[in-house]
């Protein structure tokens, strides 16, 4: 839709997917998407001003100088390239989730993700207990319950 963004790797995003898909997937990339300049601003704060070592000051700075907003957006984008019936194909899934008057997009997506997985567990769609790998969940079951609809 004409908006520009930047994407970069962040820690933890892939979680256990690297091990799960080892020798099954040629390339796995999991990135965060931000408005242009975000990464440089964070590097300046964390590295140049050394606020990575002084999180109390960083937190106070954010609380005082960065306005809170519900006017944010989460971009959920998946691209898969592979063989289907011997033909190389690409499939993509894109969903832009916006905040509303009650909740920011990050609040909506975080809460709905957790609640959707809990609902799946309560409905018996997740049988194991303890740690559950995100890649072991059924996408269909996830988005078909009332909490996962945010992602549908």
Where are these regions (language model features)?
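C-terminal catalytic/substrate-binding lobe primarily of soluble NAD(P)-dependent oxidoreductases
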Residues: 1-152
């Amino acid at each position: 839709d004409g908006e520009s963004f930047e994407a970069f790797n962040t820690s933890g995003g892939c979680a256990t997917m690297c091990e799960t898909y080892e020798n099954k997937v040629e390339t796995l990339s999991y990135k965060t998407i931000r408005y242009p300049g975000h990464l440089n601003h964070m590097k300046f704060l964390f590295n140049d001003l050394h606020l990575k070592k002084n999180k109390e000051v960083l937190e106070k700075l954010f609380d005082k100088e960065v306005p809170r907003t519900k006017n944010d957006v989460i971009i959920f984008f998946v691209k898969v390239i592979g063989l289907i019936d011997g033909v190389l194909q690409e499939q993509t899934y894109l969903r832009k989730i916006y905040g509303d008057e009650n909740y920011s997009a990050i609040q909506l997506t975080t809460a709905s993700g957790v609640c959707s997985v809990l609902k799946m567990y309560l409905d018996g769609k997740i049988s194991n207990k303890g740690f559950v790998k995100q890649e072991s969940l059924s996408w269909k079951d996830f988005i078909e319950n009332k909490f996962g609809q945010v992602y549908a």
